[in-house]
Amino acid sequence: MELDSALEAPSQEDSNLSEELSHSAFGQAFSKILHCLARPEARRGNVKDAVLKDLGDLIEATEFDRLFEGTGARLRGMPETLGQVAKALEKYAAPSKEEEGGGDGHSEAAEKAAQVGLLFLKLLGKVETAKNSLVGPAWQTGLHHLAGPVYIFAITHSLEQPWTTPRSREVAREVLTSLLQVTECGSVAGFLHGENEDEKGRLSVILGLLKPDLYKESWKNNPAIKHVFSWTLQQVTRPWLSQHLERVLPASLVISDDYQTENKILGVHCLHHIVLNVPAADLLQYNRAQVLYHAISNHLYTPEHHLIQAVLLCLLDLFPILEKTLHWKGDGARPTTHCDEVLRLILTHMEPEHRLLLRRTYARNLPAFVNRLGILTVRHLKRLERVIIGYLEVYDGPEEEARLKILETLKLLMQHTWPRVSCRLVVLLKALLKLICDVARDPNLTPESVKSALLQEATDCLILLDRCSQGRVKGLLAKIPQSCEDRKVVNYIRKVQQVSEGAPYNGT
């Protein structure tokens, strides 16, 4: 991104500022550098390098007391000018849209970042010296103007991204460390929300600086902005995040509402963080929770397993908030919940799904939905039965994650809906016995530990099924040990029979 584009032509306010600084030779020199950067000739790389070198020399040669001197009641002067310079430098070092995927601009962006990082280190060094030597608000005013742009620069280039190199990341991390040191903050979270109750923190300032780049029309112009916003958001938790909800929620929705899966996932992670760290009352106000639900649940139609995983985890934490508005009087059927809607959609997608990664993702989250609905899972019993039987029949690879999670789901289902299980005894018994036989004779390279886990879970399900059917499983299994030649299968069948007869069993 060109530095001159970050510095607009001097406004009337800038002219007044230059007049205020005219008494200071240092102020005049700084103004000259700013004007040089704003000229069309500054587009040439050698001119920029010369200006950056002049700026570095000027900072080094200037005493700290002159660097932070100001005029007027609000101490406008050099501190404000330094803030303008910091903003311009941050924009100059920011990667352009073309550099998101690396390529020729990759090394150039990293080189610019390293140069700017060294300038920021010099400025922060001056602030540290002034802090240790001056009494009064001068250095604090200067730090106030510097902190936001310096932070954005540091986060942009300290994360491992296509536009960074080990050198640029090292410099950016040094800048962040120096910034935390000079602000006397023990962590980035403390820097953002304040180290104590009396300290305001700097999140409002940083969100204000990021805001122009987070609109729907502009957020893709700088590929780093979404990562800076997301990373910053993740650092702020309860109770500080709620006061910034009006700023962080729209930006998170914008990022999630994109055609690129990577951005969808990033946006959903941001929304999930908001759900976890903002009080339910604030989310229910102005129908925000419903907006979140519709924005997030729409992603369930995108068949991408990483996205589906992020969406389901977020929805499971959002359901308790949404259900606070539901009231059941007890004189009729309970109202259908958002959890019902999502589970119905998941089961619709699960039945015909053949892609293993998606099957595992759905199966991984199914137990949480059954637990969430409890006895109300009976509304979905027929479809759950079809999904469970279908998934138990399909080999899922050496780790067998899908079948293990489906067995866990079946156990929970029988525990929550046991009065409705006995009429499905034969179907479930056949599916479980077939699974035990298939696993016991499995010729694949499935580890023995995984086979044992599958057989153990299937045995637990048979025991639960027997209890739900008042001991009918025991009678149906009575002749199997006599006719089955597979010793491993017979051993697990006998375990079920022994427990049914009252013998202790450590598997349930």
From Swiss-Prot:
One of its GO terms (biological process) is protein stabilization. One of its GO terms (cellular component) is nucleus. Transmembrane segments: none annotated. The keyword Transmembrane does not apply. InterPro entries: ARM-type_fold (IPR016024), Tti2 (IPR018870). The keyword Iron does not apply. Keywords: Disease variant, Intellectual disability. Component of the TTT complex composed of TELO2, TTI1 and TTI2. Interacts with TELO2 and TTI1. Interacts with WAC; WAC positively regulates MTOR activity by promoting the assembly of the TTT complex and the RUVBL complex composed of RUVBL1 and RUVBL2 into the TTT-RUVBL complex which leads to the dimerization of the mTORC1 complex and its subsequent activation. PANTHER family: TELO2-INTERACTING PROTEIN 2 (PTHR32226:SF2). Regulator of the DNA damage response (DDR). Part of the TTT complex that is required to stabilize protein levels of the phosphatidylinositol 3-kinase-related protein kinase (PIKK) family proteins. The TTT complex is involved in the cellular resistance to DNA damage stresses, like ionizing radiation (IR), ultraviolet (UV) and mitomycin C (MMC). Together with the TTT complex and HSP90 may participate in the proper folding of newly synthesized PIKKs. This is TELO2-interacting protein 2.
